[in-house]
Regions:
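Glycan-recognition and catalytic cores of secretory/periplasmic carbohydrate-active enzymes
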Residues: 1-168
Length: 168
């Protein structure tokens, strides 16, 4: 993101090329099983919302600063991953970690919610909705995520957003 912003500000084509190269490497690491060291053991395999969420925002930043033909396709894929695997409408929740198939892991690793992190993801999706001419589906998805996690994350006793909550 920094190299792309610098490239836009300075007109430095080498910095733009470096930003695109690093973005490609990030895509490779994010999508090639086994390339990254897993956060958890194979006892309870899982995946987190962090990678698709941050990669979506990175692609948005590259698209807005220097452009990259891969961005639109990858942003769409990462939004679908978040919606399909992490947004749980039946319990009005956005999960931080899920099993590889998107199911909830009934263990501390899978039950821990991070409301602020999910709200950040909602913000990125709403930003994308604006970019896509106020895409109704993305507005609805982002608002749903925000509503779910605001309700779960607001500290009714002291105010503010709680860092972590149990899903149940």
């Amino acid at each position: 993101i920094g190299a792309a912003a610098y490239a836009k500000a300075s007109g430095d084509k080498e910095a733009a090329n470096k930003a695109r190269f690093v973005f490609g490497k990030c895509i490779e690491y994010a999508t090639t099983p086994g390339l990254l060291q897993p956060k958890f053991t194979n006892t309870r395999p899982s995946k987190g919302i962090g990678v698709p969420m941050i990669m979506m925002n990175t692609a948005q930043q590259l698209r807005e600063t220097i452009g990259d033909p891969r961005c639109e396709e990858w942003i769409t894929k990462w939004i679908a991953e978040i919606e399909t695997n992490f947004v749980k409408d039946d319990i009005k929740c956005v999960m931080e970690q899920v099993a590889p198939d998107g199911s909830i892991i009934d263990h501390i690793d899978g039950r821990t919610l991070n409301p602020g992190h999910a709200m950040e993801g909602a913000w990125f999706i709403l930003h994308e909705a604006k970019h896509r001419n106020n895409d109704k589906h993305l507005i609805e998805l982002g608002c749903r995520m925000l509503d779910y996690m605001w309700e779960r994350g607001w500290d009714k006793e002291h105010g503010g957003i709680l860092y972590f909550r149990d899903v149940y």
